[in-house]
Amino acid sequence: MTLDLTGRVAVVTGASRGIGYFIARELAAAGAHVIAVARTVGGLEELDDQIKAAGGQATLVPLDLVDMAGIDRLGGAIHERWGKLDILVANAGVLGVISPIGHVEAKTFEKVMTINVTSTWRLIRSVDPLLRLSDAGRAIILSSNAAHSARAFWAPYAASKAAVETMMRSWAHETENLPLRVNAADPGPTRTAMRAQAVPGEDPETLPHPSEIAKRIVPLASPDLKETGLIFQAKHNRFVAYRQPE
């Protein structure tokens, strides 16, 4: 079934490249007005060109997500122009370093937590009232299997993704009696710059292109979606529930 997001307003962070770039394009192609947030102006302008060439609409927001006051202002600006928000895709994130935990520098750990966790919370806080005004608010928080695998040398990134998944589930419980649906999306290994940084010896041609992963994730923005508080595994195209340790 074709996804119809005509008249919907969507925010996508980390929209200048990778999975976020293609999610933004898919949302626009489905009819949503995309508010594209990223710190890289050139990437945003390229995205804008692609969206408009396909007949879509976008508003560009050059914003570094370490700018917490800027995130706070974003919600007010959206309310002033559109009066609501229908879709949030919290995609922006950084890897940090793949390193023994005892060798991770404090500034590196703090940057991962600031971008991946604190800015996601500030973003949620900024737009939560607007999503509640929508008749079908949808929030998609990008996560990773690293949140559960606790693999060696991935501690900062893994901890940050475990944190955002926990926030997602808590937020979903808070809003379960509202039209708002809140889920995490685990894209799995994808042909992105972050993956190349994490696993430099891997052949990228063996991985799915971010455009393919975006096509699987975007249906989570559908007004018909019923699921909330779950993790969508793009690799397997399925929802799974978080399992408490036994």
Where are these regions (language model features)?
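Conserved glycine-rich cofactor-binding loop
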Residues: 9, 16-17
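Substrate-binding pocket helix/loop in short-chain dehydrogenase/reductase
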Residues: 99-101, 105-110
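C-terminal helical subdomain
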Residues: 177-178, 184-185, 192, 200-243
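The beta1-alpha1 cofactor-binding region of Rossmann-like NAD(H)/NADP(H)-dependent oxidoreductases
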Residues: 42, 62-73, 106
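Catalytic loop of short-chain dehydrogenase/reductase
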Residues: 132, 138-163, 168-177, 189
